[in-house]
């Protein structure tokens, strides 16, 4: 080692393999099959690059920020967003060592305080229904919500409590992978909680639509990502 690298190992010693074409196969990712039967999806470098580049353009992760990786890396969103994007952004990646139950996930948020969170709806729904909604889901709480001044204070308090449950350090929560509970979504919108809903599939590597939480419209899944062609067809 000392003979080959007399002045230590430096960036110029690194030689990455260069693909012959952006269309060259990068990974075969197995999926249950949004567009049909279960299959191995052949994703080219172009697809992975486009997704990672879009994350850099739209999401506020900076070197040293924390990301909790909850999805398995065999899941295309976990691979592209949590790993490839987080790694290339210089973030610190934290992997759960136990099955990701809502309790364990909430504990990890409190300890790690991630900058941005991506998860399936069920996680947000269970945490909100268990730790936040019971505080106002009673006769007194519902009565106070009808009083304008008190209503604003309650919403501010609920937002603060909800932020604390998820670590208090995040810019937004990106939700996707399944329909979001309408009751929970209405509540989060009422208290001004920073969430957004995105849409994608393995075949697209995976991001198709996304919008920043400040411009996100409830009931939607954002706008088409750059370099992505979206066509709406009738049934």
Residue ranges and their predicted role:
Residues 7-30, 37, 60-66:
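Conserved pre-ATP/AMP-binding loop-to-beta segment of ANL
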Residues 19, 42, 118, 224:
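Short aromatic/basic micro-patch
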Residues 25, 31-34, 67, 117, ...:
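Conserved S/T- and glycine-rich ATP-binding loop of Class I adenylate-forming
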Residues 26-50:
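Conserved AMP-binding A3 loop
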Residues 37, 64-66, 90, 164-171:
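Short, surface-exposed connector motifs at secondary-structure boundaries
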Residues 49-66, 73-160, 194:
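Conserved AMP-binding/adenylation subdomain of ANL enzymes
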Residues 117, 154-235:
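Conserved AMP-binding/adenylate-forming
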């Amino acid at each position: 080692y000392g003979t080959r690298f007399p002045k230590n190992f430096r960036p110029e010693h690194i030689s990455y393999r260069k693909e012959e074409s952006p269309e060259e196969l990068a990974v075969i990712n197995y999926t249950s099959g949004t567009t049909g039967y279960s299959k191995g999806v052949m994703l080219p470098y172009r697809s992975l690059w486009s997704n990672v580049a879009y994350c850099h353009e739209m999401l506020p992760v900076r070197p040293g920020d924390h990301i909790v990786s909850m999805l398995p890396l065999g899941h295309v969103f976990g691979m592209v967003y949590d790993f490839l994007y987080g790694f290339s952004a210089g973030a610190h990646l934290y992997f759960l060592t136990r099955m990701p139950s809502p309790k364990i996930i909430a504990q990890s948020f409190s300890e790690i305080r991630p900058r941005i969170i991506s998860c399936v709806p069920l996680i947000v729904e269970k945490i909100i229904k268990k730790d936040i909604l019971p505080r106002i889901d009673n006769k007194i709480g519902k009565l106070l919500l009808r009083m304008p001044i008190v209503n604003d204070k309650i919403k501010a308090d609920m937002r603060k409590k909800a932020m604390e449950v998820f670590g208090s350090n995040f810019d937004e929560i990106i939700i996707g992978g399944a329909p979001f509970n309408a009751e929970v979504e209405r509540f989060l919108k009422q208290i001004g909680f920073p969430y957004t809903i995105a849409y994608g599939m393995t075949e697209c590597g995976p991001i198709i639509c996304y919008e920043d939480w400040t411009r996100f419209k409830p009931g939607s899944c954002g706008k088409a990502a750059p370099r992505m062609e979206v066509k709406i067809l009738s049934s």
